[in-house]
Structures are given as C-alpha cells and as structure tokens.
UniProtKB/Swiss-Prot annotation:
Function of the protein: Binds directly to 16S ribosomal RNA.
Gene Ontology MF terms in the entry: small ribosomal subunit rRNA binding; structural constituent of ribosome
Record-linked InterPro entries: Ribosomal_bS20, Ribosomal_bS20_sf
Protein name: Small ribosomal subunit protein bS20
Length: 72
C-alpha cells in the first residue's frame, strides 16, 4: 500500500514541480526578449505558485527566496 501511495505522490509532485519550472522559464523568456511588461506579468503569475509549492514542502523556502530574488 505504501508503495502505491508513494508512486501517486511522486507523480503529483513531479507535475507540480514541472508546472512551477514552466512559470519560472516564462519569466526568463520574457526577460530575454526584453519585454518588461510581459516579464512583470509573468513574474506576478509565478510568485504565488512558487510560494504555494514552498508552503506545501515541495521546494525549500530558501529556494523560493532565491528564485524570487534572482528575478526581481
């Protein structure tokens, strides 16, 4: 039973982690393109997602802080 639960949690966490990375990549892509408005919009969308994943324990709070600091 534990193995089945672990596999389910692993897939769920992988999905959430992938989603978070995608939002972070969108911010970097907007910055690379030089579009300040799009970068700000992408950053504002990314922030609560990263915060939520850190609160749930998917990533460490310091990693959350590092992502946000590097992109501001």
């Amino acid at each position: 039973k534990r193995a089945v639960q672990s596999e389910k949690a692993r897939k769920h966490n992988a999905s959430r982690r992938s989603m978070m990375r995608t939002f972070i990549k969108k911010v970097y892509a907007a910055i690379e393109a030089g579009d300040k408005a799009a970068a700000q919009k992408a950053f504002n969308e990314m922030q609560p997602i990263v915060d939520r994943q850190a609160a749930k324990g998917l990533i460490h709070k310091n990693k959350r802080a590092r992502h946000k600091a590097n992109l501001t």
